[in-house]
From Swiss-Prot:
Function per UniProt: Antimicrobial peptides that have antifungal activity against D.coniospora. Has weak antibacterial activity against Gram-positive bacteria M.luteus and Gram-negative E.coli.
Record PTM Tyrosine amide, positions in chain: 29, 39, 49, 56, 64
Tryptophan amide PTM sites in chain numbering: 73
GO MF, one example: double-stranded DNA binding
Conditions for induction: Strongly up-regulated upon D.coniospora infection.
GO cellular component: extracellular region
Gene Ontology biological process: defense response to bacterium; defense response to fungus; defense response to Gram-negative bacterium; killing of cells of another organism; neuropeptide signaling pathway
Origin species: Caenorhabditis elegans
Cleaved signal peptide residues: 1-22
Tissues expressed in: Expressed in hypoderm.
Keyword terms: Amidation, Antibiotic, Antimicrobial, Cleavage on pair of basic residues, Fungicide, Neuropeptide, Repeat, Secreted, Signal
Family designation: Belongs to the YARP (YGGW-amide related peptide) family.
Name of this chain's protein: Neuropeptide-like protein 31
Length: 75
C-alpha cells in the first residue's frame, strides 16, 4: 500500500506541474480529452483532482476517491 506521505508528495508534484501547464489539454485545469492529471474531468486523466485514474476525485486505481482501494468512499 502506498503511504500517505508518498501520496502527498505525488500530489504536490502534480500540483506544481499543473500550475506550470495550465491549459485545455494534457494536464490542464479544464476538461481535456486525454488530460494526464488536471483539476477538471479529463476523459483519460491519469491522476489529478478530477476523475482520473488516481487523484483526489473519483480515481479508479487507488486515489482518495472511490473504486479499487481508495481512501475516500470505499470500493
Amino acid at each position: 500500500m502506498i503511504s500517505t506521505s508518498s501520496i502527498l508528495v505525488l500530489v504536490v508534484l502534480l500540483a506544481c506541474f499543473m500550475a506550470a501547464n495550465a491549459q485545455w489539454g494534457y494536464g490542464g485545469y479544464g476538461r481535456g480529452y486525454g488530460g494526464y492529471g488536471g483539476y477538471g474531468r479529463g476523459y483519460g486523466g491519469y491522476g489529478g483532482y478530477g476523475r482520473g485514474y488516481g487523484g483526489y476525485g473519483r480515481g479508479m486505481y487507488g486515489g482518495y476517491g472511490r473504486p479499487y482501494g481508495g481512501y475516500g468512499w470505499g470500493k
